[in-house]
């Protein structure tokens, strides 16, 4: 009731107002008056009925509406503005408040609804420019209400009409407010149309998700998204509870649930696709919604008010409702409004009319399009969008464009509206197949025309639209985007004639593109990594690089300011690209610092991050909507960086191959085949020529026309791959010649035409026109000729048609072709020549060949021509790809950045370098530095060393710190470069690697510059003589340390104050607190570098420090101080990292500590001391070696630096460490002892004394308390003491050192458990052996070293201590320890270690070896049980060695020791040991027999045959001169080696004599040794004396005879052992007998210089060997225990005695016979003592010899014994029988 009254009130008032108007009272308005009156009457009647309450249920609303609408329609058709305004106002209100819904069918037009008629009526009120301005405003309001009202629905043609009307009002209205309002209304309408479409899908999706049983929700009112008014509307509607009727009757008679939101479409059809309802929103309720009314009213008022305001402020489009990501930032928003007063010049674009009318046109293909939409709202949006696209394509008029012209304004506003639609596009629009297709087919083609417009506004809008497409639609527009870049943007940048304005706008656009990380990476992935696409990214960067470098600005007709602006923008783009790469790969970056990141400092990461986030969100939203909206969108291929990299490599190979082909085709083909990119078959090559468009068409033609067999085959295959089926001949020829340019040579053309003709006939075998292929061949040739004739400018007289027909007579198998046919060919060629393929590079001549443009006018003309060409190409390409689908990859992987950067780092570096070098503009410098920082970051992250080093070197170069030019040239940009370098070091330290070198070098030079700049004398060191502190003036400085800074001229003499002031000013900023702190932060921040980075950092810091210190006159220690600092900072790192750091720093300290400049070395050592103290404080766990590594530099310095000052300082440092940190030292003891080891051999008494004091303190005191910690270094301690002992200059120290070594033995003895429990990581020793390996072995080994190295007194002391230790602690030694020990002991006898000088060697053998030999035997005897099994053979071998030496004393000692050893231990010998012992003696005997005596002849001496008598005399003299006592003492029997007669003899003779002499001595000693071993303590001398006494007394009484049965080793030896000894004795005897008998040889020796008082002889050896032999045999002969051997003994005895007696008879010399006297006494005496039975055998053998002996003049004693012997023979053989026993001599009575 209330609603009806309200509506009636509206209508009544409006009708009354119309009637009251005086215009209506005119006659022509009678129908209007009548209609108004009828309507008023009806309303009154209706109200009366309602008042009486008798009213029936109201009729359907549309019947009433029909009645009420007629007067308004008539009013709108009137010519009176006031009447029309009133009518429009009422209609607007009725629609706004929902009183008119217009769903009723239009009675006047079948198939339409009333609302369509209402809207049409409103639209028709606009009659062009002359329409009243008030009416125009009312029309706008009414139409906006119609479109936005939630109560009515208008679609398709009607909605197009509303938009068209507003559009026309905007164009035609002269009122600025109306124009602006119309434009704002258009924007609002479009917003509503597209938002409704989006919301419908969302609503539909929500309803599908609802469970079937859920109760229906309140309908959703469609409204503009994001508008506060509409959000209020939604709230109010949500709060209200409208009543929903059960059913609503539709005009086609169907009934449907209003909740499902059915609406009727044009012609009553409601297409449904995919089962979705037609409408996603419910039919609005019939009830009046006061909230809705209020909102709609607000909207209308808002639109008008804001429009007026905007017009006044000359503002354009309202801000879009959604955030647009990185590409639509505020800075780059294109002002959509068109300045009415702006003047533009330029030639109109290519004119290609699409439609004659400047109106939007309804959809021609209505149903076909509709059938592909899921809802009518989508169709509405599509129609509006397509219309706007077509409007934007309309050409402008001829001549310069007029900003106020309808055409231009139409174009601009259409583009603005399109931009608005695209910027606010929702998921449906962005993904639905139809919209994507529309964008491809309409919008992109439109943009290809407008994108090269000479009108800046149009161009700018086109760029803005392209940006939006790139941001929101790139997934679908891969190929279109490529065309935009390739044909428009980059062409404009590359063309030298393009205007600054166009370049500026393009580069502004690129700035936005380059700021979107996703976009930048996507461009690279989708184009540069696509085999079929252009290298957009690479080309873009190269172009931007050229712009940034500011090349050829004068050629481009730009002012310097414009060029600079362009350069800045170019640089900004390049920097943005790198920022994007940094942003893209930021997850890989590890910032060593927490204070700041590169991103926060350098780039607007927030924007970039948000942009990327939005972009990702957009991609996600598109994906989510695609499943419900569209089935035709492109699915992205998988993002695999490795795959793309492979493709990129292939592409580069192909491009290189094409480049080669375009120079020399065969080379290109060969290269591609070698790389596997092209098959070997001719078909493959032919296909390649067809498909690859980048090939030079001329080269292709030349290649195909070549006469070689291979080329022919390719040409045949090429032609065979063409299909000419059912093609006209000329058309086929055109197709054929499209692929290449015909070569100039006739023969080549001939071959090509021949094959073409054959192929054409082959494809068209059914044709009857040509008799054979010959006809086709001739005709083809003639067509080529005709083309040349008709279209060549050189040909003046063109061929006529008749001439052409005549020329072709008789070519068809001697017949003619039809004249009509030839005529048509002529006409066709005349109209359009056969255009052969042009090479692409030549399409724009000025691009490749830079022309010098004479004037601005000429440049503009050229540019317009080029733009026209560009537009044609772009449009053609755009149309060609409008239906193509190419998969677009949305990049997600971080790894794309690496190949991207690798591709473009060089042009980037060129741009930044030239920018820094040539331009002093701070903004340019700032951009360049920012770019370099980003580039360094990327190169760092991806480990690209070459690239990283190049950029860091560029920074270093532009800091001027390493430049050779004068530093006074330093500018702000150089200061900023230094700051950038410092920042890079701070933020990218983890990745800098070798680039640290440049950075640290600059920091070093910076410090020098700061010091000089501030007038402070830099810390130079000039050795001991320091120069006076003060100014630099007059300072003579070496050139090299200033070479980098260019300070040579500044600091050398003669610098004036002005120059210095200038310099100080230029470097002043580098001394600012911020720079100083930043530099310091690099070093303090080194703690946050990772393990590898800190090593690189330290390594290069050390290298720079070495450079600083390299100056011989003025070394600097800045970096050295920093090394000390960072050592402090980083000491708390994990030990693994620290050890790697110290490996580098320690090595540096090694070098610095040995610096020839003492001040440097002192600083190094002192720094080392401080660091070491701090490090030692930390302590060390067992088995670690960090201290050892840390302290090693002390060791190195001590070893290499010979400066007493430094050496003394090192010792003092170490002593200080020992005194203060002894408790914390572990592995460091090794270094400490190593340092003292070096000091121990010094010649400086102070150094030795100080070192020894500390060493003594350690060994005697510290070891007491910290022995377990020092075990690992125990060996080093002993070695160190050994070195002190070996310093001959300080004997007292030596003796004390040996005492301390003895003291160390006490530690080992007292603490064996500590040694056993100690485990070391480098010693794989059994626990039982640790005491030996760690304790005893080092002590004994070092003592052996002392013995081997020192002088007599020290080595004797060492020897004594060594054997004392053995004797004292040997009981604790294991058997295998003794083996090691004796190896050490035997080193004393090692020939290699003996002194080389003969005298020293002799002394050594006589003293030390002698001493050692006896000591060995003592030890062996003491520990025989433990040693004999393992060491007896070694001892025997050593004794043998001694015996063989050329030292008489040592040889004697060897035999004596052997004797002592056997006598001392023989009782314990086993048979095996006796065996070994006897073998040893046998070996010694054999090796010491001087066989050379019998054969030797002096070199060059002739043999002299001597007179026999002379020999005899000499011999007699020789033998008589023997001093028996001397020979008994072991003196030479040959001659005296000290005799003067030796001096004349050569050294070799002397050596030989000495050797022979010693061998003889050894033989004699051995005989004595055997004698002593067998019979000790009885001696042969004693026995001989007894025999002599007995003979003298003429008795052999038993009383005088001494029993020796139980003495000596005889009883422990077997007969076999004794036989071995007997063999030795017999051999010795035989040799000496042979020598003594060889008078001639003895004479030779004597004459060769071996002459003394007599000739040499071996008489003593001869007699003593036989005597010993006889004693043993006779002892065995009477031994009952050896009865089983008596036979052998007897045989031996008989043989020996017989030979002896026989020899004696032959001796001529009386003295010789005298020497044998004792032998004969022994022989006869012993024989007399045997039993008669045995005596018989002997007597019978000896008898004849004894008889012979009788004739010699014998001594009485011998005669007495002989007498007894003969008597005994008489008795035994019973020759005589004594009458009584008293007659038998006493000596024989025992045998009697």
UniProtKB/Swiss-Prot annotation:
SUPFAM superfamilies, per database record: ARM repeat, Sec7 domain
Modified positions (Phosphothreonine) in chain numbering: 244, 623, 633
PTM comment text: In vitro phosphorylated by PKA reducing its GEF activity and dephosphorylated by phosphatase PP1.
Comp. bias intervals (Polar residues): 214-225, 233-243
CDD domains registered for this protein in UniProt: Sec7
Subcellular location: Cytoplasm; Membrane; Golgi apparatus; Cytoplasm, Perinuclear region
Regulation of its activity: Inhibited by brefeldin A.
Name of the protein this chain belongs to: Brefeldin A-inhibited guanine nucleotide-exchange protein 2
Phylogenetic lineage: Eukaryota, Metazoa, Chordata, Craniata, Vertebrata
Name of the gene: Arfgef2
